[in-house]
């Protein structure tokens, strides 16, 4: 049995990146070879050397919504903070509301000048709330004007430019957090990668807050992931199958791309097919990868499901050794931090 403690490490607080670097691609890149255990310190732009003509680089094109709203109860003036998690249907959303005790079923909330209103419809087991919005106009436009970017709890500084918490290829609205491994790519770097003969392929997974939810059980097998919506189009599936048939590698950018590809690979016995749905796949050591052959990812929180996923691919000992190396070399950690490439 693997315990949550097996994935713990001491991280000096000053290594938690609070702001993005001026140039996206100037972050550092720790390249780890899982077969030999070799590690190389590089810069992110050097990912170009790690990709081979004929490979597919698979990226998550989800876009982060300004999903944090500040509202009040019209009858009392009491303030509430609402974080949108998942659009369940129509104008109905799963949310987290603070303070939760003020948000009973039937509670009305208004935002801004009242052009956006909501009513609490249901209380969920884990403390979340289902709410239904009422408004005139286009919901996303109202959200853009009233909402704030929901930065992770470990980032204490305000973000000057909200676009820095979006990838340059973000297109599909729906995430409560950025797929941060993609934040390092610039449009120029993607053009260089394409010019090398690498196929750029996009899928969608809308990142929920399960990403930041700590593992609260000791035996990791008892942890349940939050479900997240994913989609792989016919066109993307066709590209990936062509790459596979020609002997190229499937290289994923980030844990969200990995979880989407492996959800599909698990569902279709190792084959890649167009698909969409909800996934709660939890990848831990012992899992046999069916699609992904190499990937880039940021440095994650101790004891997190993301460190467990990296350990499933590279092995727990090598993963923790790579993290120790990154700490000694003062790599920057978490959402705005540096990256690793594992092959």
Curated annotation (Swiss-Prot):
GO molecular function, one term: S-adenosylmethionine:tRNA ribosyltransferase-isomerase activity
Record keywords: Cytoplasm, Queuosine biosynthesis, S-adenosyl-L-methionine, Transferase
Superkingdom per UniProt: Bacteria
Entry's EC annotation: 2.4.99.17
Pathway: tRNA modification; tRNA-queuosine biosynthesis
Subcellular location: Cytoplasm
GO terms under cellular component: cytoplasm
Gene Ontology biological-process annotations: queuosine biosynthetic process; tRNA wobble guanine modification
Pfam family, one: Queuosine_synth
InterPro entries linked: QueA (IPR003699), QueA_dom1 (IPR042118), QueA_dom2 (IPR042119), QueA_sf (IPR036100)
Catalyzed reaction equations: 7-aminomethyl-7-carbaguanosine(34) in tRNA + S-adenosyl-L-methionine = epoxyqueuosine(34) in tRNA + adenine + L-methionine + 2 H(+)
Family in the record: Belongs to the QueA family.
Function: Transfers and isomerizes the ribose moiety from AdoMet to the 7-aminomethyl group of 7-deazaguanine (preQ1-tRNA) to give epoxyqueuosine (oQ-tRNA).
PANTHER family (UniProt xref): S-ADENOSYLMETHIONINE:TRNA RIBOSYLTRANSFERASE-ISOMERASE
Subunit structure: Monomer.
Protein name from the UniProt record: S-adenosylmethionine:tRNA ribosyltransferase-isomerase
Species this chain originates from: Enterococcus faecalis (strain ATCC 700802 / V583)
């Amino acid at each position: 049995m693997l315990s949550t403690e097996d994935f713990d490490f001491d991280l000096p607080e000053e290594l938690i990146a609070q702001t993005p670097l001026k140039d996206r691609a100037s972050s550092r890149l720790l390249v780890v070879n899982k077969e030999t255990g070799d590690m190389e310190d590089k810069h992110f732009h050097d990912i170009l050397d790690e990709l081979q003509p004929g490979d597919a680089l698979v990226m998550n094109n989800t876009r982060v919504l300004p999903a944090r709203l500040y509202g009040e109860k019209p009858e009392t003036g009491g303030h509430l903070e609402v974080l949108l998690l998942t659009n369940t249907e129509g104008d109905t959303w799963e949310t987290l509301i603070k303070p939760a005790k003020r948000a009973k079923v039937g509670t009305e909330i208004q935002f801004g000048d009242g052009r956006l209103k909501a009513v609490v419809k249901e209380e969920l087991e884990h403390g979340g709330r289902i709410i239904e919005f009422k408004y005139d106009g286009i919901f996303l436009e109202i959200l853009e004007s009233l909402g704030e970017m929901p930065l992770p709890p470990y980032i204490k500084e305000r973000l000057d430019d909200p676009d820095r918490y979006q990838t340059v290829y973000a297109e599909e609205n729906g995430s409560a957090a950025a797929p941060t491994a993609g934040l390092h790519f610039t449009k120029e770097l993607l053009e260089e990668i394409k010019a090398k003969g690498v196929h750029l392929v996009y899928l969608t997974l809308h990142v929920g807050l399960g990403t930041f939810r700590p593992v609260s059980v000791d035996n990791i097998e008892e942890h349940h992931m939050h479900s997240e919506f994913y989609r792989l189009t016919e066109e993307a599936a066709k590209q990936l199958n062509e790459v596979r048939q020609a002997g190229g590698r499937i290289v994923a950018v980030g844990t969200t791309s990995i979880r989407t590809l492996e959800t599909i690979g698990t569902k279709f016995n190792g084959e890649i097919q167009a698909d969409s749905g909800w996934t709660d796949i939890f990848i831990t050591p012992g899992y046999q990868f069916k699609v992904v052959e190499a990937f880039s990812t940021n440095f994650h929180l101790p004891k997190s499901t993301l460190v467990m996923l990296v350990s499933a691919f590279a092995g727990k000992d090598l993963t923790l050794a790579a993290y120790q190396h990154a700490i000694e070399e003062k790599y920057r950690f978490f959402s705005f931090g540096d990256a690793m490439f594992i092959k």
